[in-house]
A protein has these predicted regions:
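Conserved glycine-rich
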Residues: 226, 230-233
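Short alpha-helical Gxxx[C/S/T] motif in the catalytic ATP-binding
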Residues: 213, 217
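Conserved DHp (HisKA) dimerization/phosphotransfer helix of two-component histidine kinases, i.e.
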Residues: 2, 66-116
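Short beta-strand/loop element within the Bergerat-fold HATPase_c
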Residues: 164-177
Length: 252
């Protein structure tokens, strides 16, 4: 699979001449088709295996007591998740834009996330500045990006034992010709040696996950003509924000 840096180099080469652009466009299309085909071919037998396990359980409930039976279920669920995220990553640059009122859109996301952490001790601070644009965007994919970033922040503050209240900040504002959205937390932070790799596919420093969430998020934002960056200082005191992901999308 191509990394983000690979794609950047390919696009630089494509800009050199129409002939190179045509050739590499065909190559990239073929690459995406290969990933889609592989995902499809694996998903079908995996679904059959999962269905067979359910039939076995229904007919023979005693198998639930077999050692590692639950691990088998977990492994299959992981494979299903991996295939879904791989397919999503492959299609990350394909947008279906529609007119999006970002004031309404972001407030709905903030409300949805706040509801999901209501039973935790997390303090969620949302600040949606007035005057946000109404502009074309793929709201479904942007929602996926923002909920992924907020979910990562939630995980970071929950696994980090601190004497301070866990906090997540969600801030959106308009800066000249850009829409800017940031997600910050005072969790564990990201080690400096890991920062350069977190947007690469299959790189993860969590105990669970596929390592495709952040690469997919960056791909979606770049498809909107924007950027997704991160700044983290894990050595700061627990009372301070340690990690901030900043999403910038140009306003037409």
């Amino acid at each position: 699979m191509f990394t983000e840096s690979d794609y950047e180099k390919l696009h630089q080469i494509m800009a050199e001449s129409p002939e190179k652009e045509e050739l590499l466009t065909k190559l990239l299309h073929s690459h995406r088709m290969d990933i889609s085909t592989i995902s499809h071919e694996i998903r079908n037998p995996l679904t059959l295996i999962y269905s067979t396990l359910q039939i076995i359980e229904a007919s023979n409930p005693e198998v639930l007591n077999i050692r590692h039976w639950s691990d088998l279920h977990s492994d299959i669920e992981y494979m299903k998740q991996l295939l879904e995220e791989l397919s999503a990553y492959n299609n990350g640059q394909r947008l279906s834009p529609s007119s999006t009122n970002f004031d309404i859109f972001l407030k709905k996301i903030a409300l949805s996330f706040a509801s999901s952490i209501i039973e935790t001790d997390i303090e969620f601070i949302s600040r949606i500045e007035p005057g946000l644009p109404v502009m074309p965007a793929d709201s479904i994919k942007l929602q996926e990006v923002l909920l992924n970033l907020l979910g990562n922040a939630r995980d970071a503050v929950l696994i980090h034992q601190s004497t301070y209240s866990p906090q997540i900040h969600f801030h959106a504002w308009k800066d000249h010709s850009n829409l800017i959205i940031s997600v910050s937390d005072n969790g564990c932070g990201i080690a400096p040696e890991h920062l350069s790799a977190i947007f690469e596919p299959f790189v993860t420093y969590k105990s669970s996950g596929t390592g495709l969430g952040l690469p997919l998020s960056r791909r979606i934002i770049e498809a909107h003509g924007g950027t997704l960056t991160v700044h983290s200082e894990p050595d700061l005191p627990d009372c301070q924000v340690k990690t901030t992901f900043t999403l910038t999308i140009p306003i037409p």
